[in-house]
Amino acid sequence: MSAMTPREIVHELNKHIVGQEEAKRAVAIALRNRWRRMQLDSSLRDEITPKNILMIGPTGVGKTEIARRLAKLADAPFLKVEATKFTEVGYVGRDVESIIRDLADMAVKMLREQEMKRHEHRALDAAEDRILDALLPPPRDFNEDSQRTNADSSTRQLFRKKLREGELDDKEIEIDLRSSGAGVEIMAPPGMEEMTSQLQSMFSNLSSDKRKTRKMKVADAMKRVKDEEAAKLVNEEEIKQKAIQAVEQNGIVFIDEIDKVAKRSENTSSDVSREGVQRDLLPLIEGSTVSTKYGSIRTDHILFIASGAFHLSKPSDLIPELQGRLPIRVELQALTPDDFKRILTEPDASLVQQYEALMGTEGVKLTFADDAIARIAEVAYKVNETTENIGARRLHTVLERLLESLSYDAGDQVTDTFEVTADYVDEKLGELSEDEDLSRYIL
């Protein structure tokens, strides 16, 4: 679990997301409260439930990006799902309990990787010995003492040095490896993914103990053998127990597109698939027990963050019980021309840096003048205002259109340097941005 302070979390989010300070503060506080709760006595800890968050804002302003970046910072089981993927229990499709099952799978995978990394040095030593045994097999008539002498011989040490320096990477060896199984693929009806995964697990376990001699290069064999040796050092039962605890105490679920399952105000009929999903989410968010292949998981202390654009519906169109379980409301603001300018240049791996790097692979040094950045931002903002507002995603469309001819000609190395100026932006995009009919279809 991450022990970062709210200020540190916001600072990390600022590297990738422009503006939306209120939303960043809300998720930073929620993440820090997870850590604070774990410092308390167990009696008080059980009484403190997470304050779930509802993020409201137009598309393309950073709701999903906040979730993506938060997943990397959390150092806890984190799952992002779309509310539209689920259907009411009893109907064809995935039921909401599969969210917790997927979260448990994520936790097991995360903890297994951490454990394998912890045992990396021991696994590497064991892998080196197996590779050296394949390179320098001991004579058959050697007894145990002779083998021990051979292990410490100068020849073996010389080969070990060469192996570590990569001089033997291209040499082919024959080595005994665990069989990867037949790769049984089972197609199941929607809503029966749990049964499918259990059947696949059963078939893979049947062949997991079989071993097969393979011929491969030392570099490839080292990776396979190292993973095999690390897996031997990992206690799977302990990982499963830790995973259940991690999900129950620190799990975070981000539910995107929650507005798509809200019943619209003008539609008075009871829509089964929409309202049913909301009602199924209630016990999950409030606290219930879900059965998974690792054991039962209680959802009382899992943090839920929901988000939606709410273009065609309002937060009040969600059923009242669900509204009550999302007590913290955060409104994300629509982007301004200044925000667009900052998005183009400020974040790590910004759009401008990406295009400069892509053109650099063709030997073209691409630069953007300050007035060009401002003009691109104005065009994106104007098109958003006159057509559909798709937020920062409009910049991708505008930049692709702007640099289309340069991208096409760059392979022929027409020029070594190219500066995008405001005049060039006007030449390529001026007519399109002015003509609403054209921009509606092209930008």
UniProtKB/Swiss-Prot annotation:
Binding site for ATP: V18, G60, V61, G62, K63, T64, E65, D256, E321, R393
Signal peptide: none
UniProt entry keywords in alphabetical sequence: ATP-binding, Chaperone, Cytoplasm, Nucleotide-binding, Stress response
Any one annotated GO CC term: HslUV protease complex
Subunit structure: A double ring-shaped homohexamer of HslV is capped on each side by a ring-shaped HslU homohexamer. The assembly of the HslU/HslV complex is dependent on binding of ATP.
Family: Belongs to the ClpX chaperone family. HslU subfamily.
Chain's role: ATPase subunit of a proteasome-like degradation complex; this subunit has chaperone activity. The binding of ATP and its subsequent hydrolysis by HslU are essential for unfolding of protein substrates subsequently hydrolyzed by HslV. HslU recognizes the N-terminal part of its protein substrates and unfolds these before they are guided to HslV for hydrolysis.
Protein name in the entry: ATP-dependent protease ATPase subunit HslU
Lineage summary: Bacteria, Pseudomonadati, Pseudomonadota, Gammaproteobacteria, Pseudomonadales
